[in-house]
Amino acid sequence: MLAQTVESYVVLDNASGTLTFKHDANKPAGAFSLNEGELYPAWYAMAGDDTGYNENNIKKVVFDSSFANARPTNCCFWFVGCKDLIVIEGLEYLNTEKVTSMRSMFASCINLTSLDVSKFRTQNVTDMYYMFGDCSSLTSLDVSKFDTRNVTDMDYMFNNCSNLTSLDVSKFDTQNVTSMLTMFKGCSSLTSLDLSNFDTQNVTNMYGMFDGCVNLATIYASDKFVTTACSEDCKIFGNCKKLVGAVPYDPNRVGKEMANYTTGYFTYKAASGIDAVSTTENVAAEYYDVNGRRLNAPQKGLNIVKCGNRTTKVLVK
């Protein structure tokens, strides 16, 4: 008797609208294999209409405990357009250490109110395009531990996540990202964003990046946030009416020239913070650059100066 092959597969129960991911040797007839490359998963053609997009049928997703032994390489489009999806169970059994694409993974899951991706291993992911886009009912999302060092595309990543009141992207490594088109557009409940670690030297498109963030008051950024590679007509700050940085918001000035903390809408925060020290002694001033490196003397540009129990920023021209 031949041993059965252990494999990853997905079962769709149309009656209950439940999509179950498993990894064992008991793949039943009619089960689907995981998708590869940029292809839509096979369960869409079965659950949805002729376009291949599922809109109404999938209501629940379950990752069986057996799926903990699976090592998918691609999660793109897994749940895109699942407008009636309200719960995902067993997400802790999804090991993403070998995944390279999370493109549109949860996009347009408009009735999903909670999503725990805090255990995701994303060190090999290159594509996060539209990953959470239009998840308009999400009230919390923990992406604080995401390793984004290899990501190149963050277009639409949080687009229209209108019920998120906070979003911690302070540790995102964006040095390889080339596009952030409408990345935070329509995040109308956010009041602040910490982008102090964002290195945008390779980003060529930031169009609409913060468009419609109507309650966003503060964007923290460092010298690593630059727009030198973006086109001149890159309108970044449309309808950010509460935003205040070095200057208050002006609806007639929404372009890339306002993406700075000296004459624009950003508020300075060093990428590597230098904490203030407390002392009762008289001490000489110490100088650091914005990355926390000790200097022998002030240099041109922004300097961090520590003197006694005070830490201040000094711009040397």
Residues covered by each model-derived region:
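Negatively charged
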Residues: 2-271
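A short beta-strand micro-motif
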Residues: 10-11, 287, 305
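Short, ordered coil/turn segments that flank beta-strands lining enzyme active or ligand-binding pockets
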Residues: 15, 290-292, 307
